[in-house]
Amino acid sequence: MTEKIAILIDSCSDAPQYLQDKDYVKTVSMQIHWDGKVLRDRVDISPDQFYRKIKHGASIPTTSSPQSGDILEKFQELEKEGYRDVIAICISSGLSTTYNQISLLASQQSNLNIKVIDTKNIGIGSGLFAVYADDLIKKSFPFQKLCN
């Protein structure tokens, strides 16, 4: 029997769109703080909109990790969809608190077996971890082997 494995990524892990569109892949949005507003990356503002604003002289924003409620919501969605095993792929813990935050929240989930990966990368470097995990899932790798 094939295991039902999900992938959770943060929005700074630039995984290809085809991967983000899969039912078993969930994305938690980083927060962008810009001119007094808090925007969810790839929800409230697209990468194209972001770069257009920068090009037209907008102030430089700051970012923060996803809200705990958003992460918990994704965990709940996965559980309701019948997933028990989740591989959470995060950008570098040296650049963001996202890894620590997801690790803490994952440890509180009694109905999900969650392996949190610190890619020690950002952007496409982190996104490639998600591509690789997806490839191993398609090849029916068991969850424990996938996590190693």
Give the predicted meaning of each segment.
Residues 97-148:
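Active-site histidine-anchored catalytic micro-motif
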Residues 1-2:
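A short acidic-Thr-Gly-centered motif at the start of a beta-strand
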Residues 38-88, 92-108:
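Class I S-adenosyl-L-methionine
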Residues 5-65:
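N-terminal glycine-rich anion-binding loop in soluble enzyme alpha/beta folds
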Residues 8-9, 88-92, 117-118:
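Short beta-strand segments
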Residues 23, 83, 110-112:
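Short glycine/proline-enriched coil/turn segments at helix->beta-strand junctions
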Residues 33-35, 94, 122:
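Surface-exposed, flexible loop/turn segments at secondary-structure boundaries
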